[in-house]
A protein has these predicted regions:
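Short amphipathic alpha-helical interaction segments
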Residues: 331-343
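Minor-groove-contacting beta-hairpin "wing" of winged helix-turn-helix DNA-binding domains
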Residues: 356-360
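C-terminal scaffold of the Radical SAM
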Residues: 5-9, 28-53, 57-332, 392-397
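Conserved N-terminal Rossmann-fold NAD(P)-binding element of oxidoreductases
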Residues: 12
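Short, amphipathic alpha-helical interaction segments positioned at domain boundaries
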Residues: 364-397
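Local cysteine-cluster metal-coordination motifs and their immediate loop/turn environment
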Residues: 15-26
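A short, conserved structural fragment
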Residues: 345-355
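Flexible, acidic/Gly-rich N-terminal and inter-domain linker regions that tether
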Residues: 1-8, 18, 45, 347, ...
């Protein structure tokens, strides 16, 4: 009998969009019926090829991301999910998420088709409740459509709805951000993500960065801290830097990334960490449709710095770093990092947990700097150990 491995997550990339947003650098292309049919066939073929490798796992999360998966249409999405369920050991309680734009999620009939097919979590790209701000960043929906999509989704049977918001938008005021949070909270989604705007090179918003007026760093910090307080006061616990959920509605799929669990990706640009190898497919729709599954990157466990990665990812979460787990798993002393964490604790940026350390909301704001400092302390410890081994003075502590 094969030994059952830890549960596996599946990520399925749908690269089609009605219109690319001004800030987006994800791999996405204009929607075309002929391409969508061919792509659906290619995905199903790829899923069938990989399915035998999942037999010793339980697949407990499936995530359709993009792009805008909802533009693929309910029937195509249903056929892809059917291939997943037929070929992979998907658990009865699996979390199956579909990303959607509000303008494409107002059709109750289509939503019912998706719900009956097995989708049970809907993630809506809301971004703002201010229609003027939505137009400024190239979004094609209105907040009225957000409200309509929530009503339709509830009627279709969705009991788990997530909404993405962005702060730091061009010209955005604190009042607009507060109003957005109030409007979204009133819709009672189970999960809310709040992301600071990132100006990615090559995007229209990046090219216009000198023409636009953006909230400065202090203003964005105030927006973030306001969101943390407002959401927690309304029953949304913060479980990761940008993510908040009602109890029991944390994104199980995204937790796999932060907990360094295995996931397999399908589609051009999709990433995987599966079978001891991390890899990604090239961003080439036509090549993928033609069956050319070319990797853009690939690393084995032997070359990955998992200890550094654990520090980086765990400090993104409310769980934080588990001291004993770190020392036993990576055979590294925690003390050099703990000395720094004590200093961060005194500054109000970190706090102790039952098993180790986590960052505070203010610590999350400067998490990149903190993580770099901790990883540098870890690197210095490794260097000292290597020097001790070379000199013959090393002993296990």
């Amino acid at each position: 009998m094969k030994k059952e491995k830890a549960p596996l997550g599946l990520y399925i990339h749908i690269p089609f969009c009605r219109q690319k947003c001004a800030y987006c650098d994800f791999y996405s292309l204009p929607s075309r019926e002929d391409k969508m049919d061919a792509y659906t066939d290619a995905l199903i073929r790829h899923i069938r090829e990989v399915a035998p490798r999942t037999e010793s796992h339980r697949v407990d999360t499936v995530y359709f991301g993009g792009g805008t998966p909802s533009y693929l249409g309910a029937e195509r999405l249903r056929s892809i999910l059917r291939a997943v369920m037929k070929g992979c050991p998907v658990t009865r309680d699996a979390e199956i998420t579909l990303e959607a734009n509000p303008d494409s999620a107002c059709d109750i009939k289509a939503l019912r088709t998706l719900r009956r097919a097995g989708f049970n979590r809907l993630s809506l790209g809301v971004q703002s409740a201010d229609d003027g701000l939505l137009r400024a960043i190239g979004r094609i929906h209105t907040f009225a459509q957000v409200q309509q999509s929530v009503t339709a989704a509830r009627k279709a049977g969705f009991r788990n709805i997530s909404m993405d918001l962005i702060y730091g938008l061009p010209g955005q005021t604190m009042q607009q951000w507060e109003d957005t949070l109030s409007a979204v909270i009133a819709l009672a989604p189970e999960h809310i993500s709040c992301y600071g705007l990132k100006l990615e090179p090559g995007t229209p918003l990046y090219e216009r960065r000198l023409e636009e007026t953006f909230p400065d760093d202090d203003a964005q910090a105030d927006m973030y801290l306001y969101a943390v307080t407002a959401l927690e006061q309304n029953g949304y616990g913060q479980y990761e830097i940008s993510n908040f959920a009602k109890p029991g509605y944390e994104s199980r799929h995204n937790l796999k990334y932060w907990r360094m669990q295995e996931y397999a990706g399908f589609g051009p640009g999709a990433h995987s960490d599966f079978g001891g190898v991390r890899y990604a497919y090239v961003r080439d729709l036509d090549g993928y449709i033609g069956g050319r599954l070319i990797l853009s990157e690939s690393e084995s466990d032997a070359t990955l710095a998992r200890d550094y990665e654990y520090v980086m990812l765990s400090l993104r979460t409310a769980e934080g770093i588990d001291r004993r787990y770190f020392e036993t798993t990576y055979r590294q002393r925690f003390q050099p990092m703990e000395e720094l964490l004590v200093q961060y604790e005194q500054a109000g940026l970190a706090c102790r947990t039952e098993n180790g350390w986590r960052l505070t909301p203010r610590g999350f704001l400067v998490s990149n700097s903190i993580i770099v400092a901790l990883e540098d302390a870890l690197a210095q410890q490794k260097l000292r150990r290597e020097q001790a081994v070379a000199s013959g003075n090393y002993r296990v502590i």
